[in-house]
Amino acid sequence: RVYIYGSHDRAGSDDFCDYVLKCWSAPVNDLNNWVCHGVTFRVKPDGDFPSDTDWTPDKNQILFAPDVVCRNGKYYLYAYIVNATGCVAVSDRPEGPFTLLSKYKYTISDEICCNGWFIDPGVLVDDDGRTYIYCGYERSFMAEVDTDTMYTIKDNSCIEHIIPITTDNDGGFDTEETLFFEACSPRKVGDTYYLIYSPKRGPRLAYATSDKPTGPFKYRGYIVDNGVDYPGGNDHGSIAQINGQWYIFYHRMTNGTIMSRRACVEKIEILPDGTIPPVEMTSLGFEDSLDPYRITEA
């Protein structure tokens, strides 16, 4: 099955996201048949269900962009809690529910990791089992995770500005469309490491590549632009290969508001030189466009 993890906007809300995370999945051979597995993690009491965290009583402490990785048959949720220390939770099943393991343990300066928030965590389990976390808001950093715990950040492993916030012509980061804003998502394709992120020109998902997980990274282009250009109208997402086809998962705005985002997906192609040609934003999902040469019943 294919699983999607993300923050959860409430319809008609005046705020981003919610105090719960949900998971959706579909069979790899039927990508139009999605089911919701319900709440997988929460930071507030929810009816008969207690909070999964005991340090998030404030109403403004809600769940933003998470990530989930699998290692040794366990599924690890990396939760970004606004205005609170982030944490890692674990499950035996990809759909959860996830049980709290621990807050992050780290010696990185609070200035770098935003007082332990670890904003927009993206996690990569490499082929050799080593695990890396990439984070940041208006400044990026990465570090290695101790796989004995999956929540401890290894000492002296932090690298700042993995994607720069000021122009750096050596790496091709020379305009606002290339510089870092937020939304790290690491992937490995063959021997190449990709870091997908939201640049200062927010509506896009840009990407950079390196031959090492620790960089240095080189700007390669953008994958999709969700078509808005106003404050807060940024994009989050990543790429995945399903049945031999690569896709970009991302979100777009709904009904002219930035607070009710909806998930989208487009087919992409990774060329032999590692570049990804930009694709158009659509609402097709996994369907193909209508054939203009065939009658379509409606």
Predicted regions span which residues?
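Carbohydrate-active catalytic/glycan-binding domains of CAZyme proteins
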Residues: 1-298
